[in-house]
Amino acid sequence: APRRAWRLAAVSAAGLAYLASETVLKDALTADACRWCRPPGIDESIRDSLVWNDRAQADTLSNLTGYVAAPIVGIGITAIWAASNTASGESTFGRILDDTLPVAEAVAYSQLLVQAVKFSVGRQRPRVRFAQEPGQPGNDDNVSFFSGHSALTFALATSAGMVARRHGSRLEPMVWALGYGLAGTTAFLRVAADEHYATDVALGSAFGIAAGYLLPRLLDDFRRRHGLALLPASGGMTLAGAF
């Protein structure tokens, strides 16, 4: 229980940091002007082939697949499987946390890394570069590299798939198929919406797969080695471990 509390606190803090970087801190963190403005020829060619006339619709659909459908599949199926396979005497809520936290950790920590890259690189979004008429500058104009939607959905799909594999879940094929199907659809829609270039979503997808596979393993190994736990202390909580 103390270890679960520490993990939940850490992933919640990461989630809040991400939300802050997307809201109150975004103006201060994003580049005022693009640092990477001109796309390579292959990006421009793919963009011309895939961009939709109705970019707003593609953007809306990518948000639905990326922020609604993918989490429902990745976390929802994992939670349902955990609840239905709780051992006798085991806490159902504890089992759900144990199985869904690796997924949440992979997403939250990888998204912080994505934000750091986006703000540092300052790549101009294609919708800004190819706009027929210059629009009002915004804090979302120069965060094209690399795609956060793609990284998120592939991290969700991969980490959920790995949890299902670890438990020998009969739902594993469904988790992989639905998760990667939604992730691939989301990546395509980000290009169709003119929000990202093909290289943005390709690297975002690869990063998400790597994060979904590696982060839960690395974090679990670190915790086992150092015995990290969040324990009650006078006036609050303390982080205990062996180093």
Spell out what each predicted region is.
Residues 83-87:
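Membrane-helix interface/capping segments
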Residues 25-42:
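Interfacial/capping segments of alpha-helical transmembrane domains
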